[in-house]
Curated annotation (Swiss-Prot):
Record GO cellular component, one term: extracellular region
Function of the protein: Alpha toxins bind voltage-independently at site-3 of sodium channels (Nav) and inhibit the inactivation of the activated channels, thereby blocking neuronal transmission. Electrophysiological studies of this were performed using sodium-channels expressed in F11 cell culture, by patch-clamp recordings. Affinity of this toxin toward sodium channels in F11 cell line is in the order of 1 uM concentration.
Domain LCN-type CS-alpha/beta: start-end pairs: 2-63
Disulfide bonds: 12-62, 16-34, 20-44, 24-46
Keyword Nucleotide-binding set for record: no
GO biological process, one term: defense response
Primary location class: secreted
Source organism: Androctonus crassicauda
Compartments reported by the entry: Secreted
Protein name: Sodium channel alpha-toxin Acra4
Stored Pfam families: Toxin_3
Keywords carried by this UniProt record: Disulfide bond, Ion channel impairing toxin, Neurotoxin, Secreted, Toxin, Voltage-gated sodium channel impairing toxin
Keyword Iron-sulfur in annotation: no
Length: 65
């Protein structure tokens, strides 16, 4: 398990909607909160996510189209 900014399959963060605590728990984490991530803005930070749930990799950009 690890802590981090939860992301979708394109390495894009979730922007605090839906509420982070529910999103993180739904994905197997212990808890979640809204935090500021440069340059993404407000994003969901999760504690104790399972290893199979993707978290933000700063070496790759978000690839939304």
């Amino acid at each position: 398990v690890r802590d981090g900014y939860i992301v979708d399959d394109k390495n894009c963060v979730y922007h605090c909607i839906p509420p982070c605590d529910g999103l993180c728990k739904k994905n197997g984490g212990k808890s979640g909160s809204c935090s500021f991530l440069v340059p993404s803005g407000l994003a969901c930070w999760c504690k104790a996510l399972p290893d199979n749930v993707p978290i933000k990799d700063p070496s790759y950009k978000c690839h939304k189209r």
